[in-house]
């Protein structure tokens, strides 16, 4: 199972269907979680970074985009702890796991507060995401949603006329993908759905993916700075949120960090990441059931 498959099987299908800040203790915990055999790599220079070096680089950005494999709990733990360390401001945390327009107001338990904001703990299992949100609550940062409204996705898949809402149409036109980026997105969606994606699904799925990235970018730009938590596919520079931000807000300083699974990257593998990510944080691969084994598609709506 390739990394890109885990990006999309656990992301697009979910979208469519379903005060210890900066303390030495926090720093020590985060440092201990970094496996020296699976480092943080700066893609441009191919240098290995310490956590402290990465933090200093992220502090310079207007917008920091942190990726993930959705089912890897260590990615969520590392990102939560990283946000605790980025304590120079109270940047808003923008998340994929809530719809755009939703904001978490903590009252009572963390899970109850998230449910009130529309969080789906079946789509985003609490056993995996719970520690992340508990850490975000400690950080005292605002948490807002950015995902595409499901009614838009349903309209696209039902074949509705003019399904792109007026609020996103201008940015959709401004951020049109180049032919190579469009081809890369198409291929990744096909591979990411195990080669089982019916041809009739491809065009609407690509549109949903693009509008989701635009929705995320718009929510970020409502603030002077922010941190996005989303799947690695959404934070890609060639066809994800950074591409949208570059098209509609070219003067903003955007940095992305992919959290991925690998025992190591050679120079060729690093070169393949050059047009996608600024930094890659490697973690130990986890054991998982093959998501392709039971993946099936019904007939698209006509």
Residue ranges of predicted features:
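Membrane-embedded segments
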Residues: 70-81, 94, 100-109
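Bacterial N-terminal signal peptides that target proteins for export
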Residues: 2-11
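Zymogen propeptides
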Residues: 46-87
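C-terminal regions of proteins
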Residues: 215-224, 234-302
